[in-house]
Design a protein with these regions (language model features):
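N-terminal binding-site loop/beta-alpha segment at the start of enzyme catalytic domains
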Residues: 2-117
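Beta/alpha (TIM)-barrel catalytic core signal, keyed to glycine-rich beta->alpha loops juxtaposed to Asp/Glu
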Residues: 37, 166-317
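Conserved beta-strand positions in the central sheet of alpha/beta enzyme cores
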Residues: 55, 90-92, 159-162, 192, ...
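Non-cysteine beta-strand/loop elements that form the S-adenosyl-L-methionine
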Residues: 57, 118-122, 239-242
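A short acidic, helix-capping loop that chelates divalent metal ions and anchors anionic groups
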Residues: 62-66, 126-132, 249, 296-299
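Short, acidic/polar
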Residues: 70-82, 138-151
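Structural motif corresponding to the early beta-alpha repeats
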Residues: 112-137, 164
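CE4/NodB-like, metal-dependent polysaccharide N-deacetylase domain
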Residues: 141-162, 182-185
Length: 317
C-alpha cells in the first residue's frame, strides 16, 4: 500500500476484489489461479491440506446472539458463495452456531463443494437456550455431535474437527480419545482444539495428533502467545478468533491505538489493518474474519493485500 490515503474502492481494486463474480467451483478459486484471498499466501494444515491464509468464520451468518435462523437466509448464503469466489478455501463453523443452523447453511450454499475447499467445524458445546454455551465433552456426546455435523454438512469426512472447549467435568483424555477413535474410523481427517492454553495443548497432543489451535487473539489481546509459540515451533496452525474485539482483560490497548493510527495513515479500515497485523504477526496464523455482509466480506478479503513491514510491526508494539 502507498503512503497516501486511499478510498475504499481503491483498496478493493488493489486487492482485486472488485471483479466479476464466478460460479462456485468453476472459477479462479477452484482452478488454483490467483485470487484476492490468495494474496495472503498459503499454509498447510496437517501436512496435506493447503489453504489460502485468509479464511472465513461463518459464525455471524445465523441469527442475533448466534441463535436461530439468519434474518435473511438467501443473503447469508450469498456471503458464503462470494467468499469462495474471492478465493477463500477455508471455512470455519461449529455445531453450536444456531445451533446447527450454520452447518446447514454452508451445505445449502456450497454443496457440491468446490475442489480444494476445506471445512472445519467444532463440537463440545451445547446451546440449551440463547444465553447458554454449556460444555459437553462426554465421549458419547462428541460422537453424536460429529456424526450429526457430517450429515448437516453432507460430508463423508470432516477435514478439521475441533474440540470447541474443555469440559471441566470430563477428563480431557476421554474427550480427545473419542475424537481420535472417530479419526481412525475415517470420519475426521484432522483434529484441532479451541480455547486451550499451552499446558492443555501439551496434554492433548499426548492423546491425538493435534494440527491446529483456535484461540482468541488480536492486537490488544495476546494472552495466547505461549500457544502461538508452540504452533510456530511444531508446525501447527493457529486460528485466531475475535480479531477486532476489546475486553477488560486486554493488555495491549496502546498497540491497538497505534494500529488505528497506522490504518488511518495508510487509508485502510481498522478491520483490514487488524487482519493484516495478524498475517504479519506469524506465518502460523490463519485468520478467519466473519461477517453477514458481502460488502464487509470483500473489505476483509482485501486485507490480504495489505502489508505491514517488520519495522512498522515493531513500532505498533
Amino acid at each position: 500500500m502507498t503512503m497516501t490515503t486511499l478510498t475504499r474502492r481503491q483498496v478493493l481494486q488493489h486487492a482485486g476484489v472488485l471483479m466479476t463474480g464466478v460460479a462456485v467451483g468453476t472459477g479462479a478459486a477452484a482452478a488454483g489461479r490467483a485470487t484476492p484471498a490468495s494474496q495472503a499466501g498459503t499454509l498447510v494444515i496437517g501436512k496435506d491440506l493447503t489453504v489460502n491464509r485468509l479464511g472465513f468464520g461463518a459464525m455471524r451468518l445465523v441469527g442475533p446472539d448466534i441463535w436461530g435462523e439468519p434474518l435473511d437466509r438467501e443473503a447469508a448464503k450469498a456471503v458464503l458463495r462470494r467468499a469462495v469466489e474471492l478465493g477463500v478455501n477455508f471455512i470455519d463453523t461449529a455445531d453450536a452456531y444456531g445451533p446447527a443452523t450454520d452447518e446447514v447453511l454452508i451445505a445449502e450454499a456450497l454443496y457440491p463443494y468446490p475442489k480444494g475447499l476445506v471445512i472445519a467445524t467444532k463440537g463440545g458445546i451445547v446451546r440449551p437456550s440463547r444465553e447458554r454455551w454449556d460444555r459437553d465433552g462426554r465421549p458419547e456426546h462428541l460422537r453424536a455431535a460429529c456424526e450429526a455435523s457430517l450429515k448437516r454438512l453432507r460430508l463423508e469426512r470432516i477435514d478439521l474437527y475441533q474440540l470447541h472447549a474443555i469440559d471441566p467435568n470430563v477428563p480431557l483424555e476421554d474427550s480427545l480419545g473419542e475424537i481420535a477413535k472417530l479419526q481412525r474410523e475415517g470420519k475426521i481427517r484432522h483434529v484441532g482444539v479451541s480455547n486451550f492454553n499451552a499446558d492443555e495443548l501439551a496434554r492433548a497432543r499426548k492423546v491425538v495428533d493435534v494440527v491446529s489451535v483456535q484461540n482468541r487473539y488480536n492486537v490488544s489481546d495476546r494472552s495466547s502467545d505461549a500457544v502461538l509459540a508452540v504452533c510456530e515451533r511444531d508446525g501447527l496452525v493457529f486460528i485466531p478468533w475475535s480479531p477486532l474485539s476489546q475486553s477488560p482483560r486486554d493488555s495491549n490497548a496502546g498497540a491497538r491505538t497505534a494500529l488505528e493510527a497506522w490504518a488511518k495513515a495508510r487509508g485502510v479500515s481498522f478491520p483490514q489493518a487488524a487482519i493484516a497485523w495478524l498475517l504479519a504477526r506469524s506465518p502460523a496464523m490463519l485468520p478467519i474474519p466473519g461477517t453477514s455482509s458481502v460488502a464487509h466480506l470483500e473489505e476483509n478479503v482485501a486485507a490480504a493485500a495489505v502489508r505491514i513491514t517488520d519495522a512498522e510491526m515493531r513500532a505498533i508494539g
